[in-house]
C-alpha cells in the first residue's frame, strides 16, 4: 500500500532542523520552502484519505449490487410476438374505398 512507502509526515517536515555551515543556506528561504511542502503534503494526505473512503464506499456498493443480482430469480426472456401493424389513415381508407367503388360500380355503368 502507498502509506507503507511514505517515509515523512507533515510533522516530520515541520520539525526538521538543518545544520548551518559557514556559508550555509538562507534559513528564511528554506523555512518558506518547507512551509510550502507541508501545505502540499497535508493537501495530498487529505485527498488520499478522501479517495480511500470513496474507494471503500464504491466497493461496498459493488458488493451490494452483486449480491442483489444473484438474489434476483432468472426469468426467461420473452421475445415479443410480432403484431400486425395497421397504419392505415383515413385518406388511405377513402382512396381504397373509392377504387373499389370504381371497380364495382364503374363496370356496371358501362354495361
Swiss-Prot record:
Divisome component that associates with the complex late in its assembly, after the Z-ring is formed, and is dependent on DivIC and PBP2B for its recruitment to the divisome. Together with EzrA, is a key component of the system that regulates PBP1 localization during cell cycle progression. Its main role could be the removal of PBP1 from the cell pole after pole maturation is completed. Also contributes to the recruitment of PBP1 to the division complex. Not essential for septum formation. Residues 38-72 form a coiled coil. GO terms for biological process: cell division; regulation of cell shape. The keyword Coiled coil applies. Keywords: Cell cycle, Cell division, Cell shape, Coiled coil, Cytoplasm. Forms polymers through the coiled coil domains. Interacts with PBP1, MreC and EzrA. It is found in: Cytoplasm. The keyword Cell division applies. GO terms for cellular component: cytoplasm. It comes from Bacillus cereus (strain ATCC 10987 / NRS 248). Pfam families: DivIVA (PF05103). This is Cell cycle protein GpsB. Belongs to the GpsB family. The gene is gpsB.
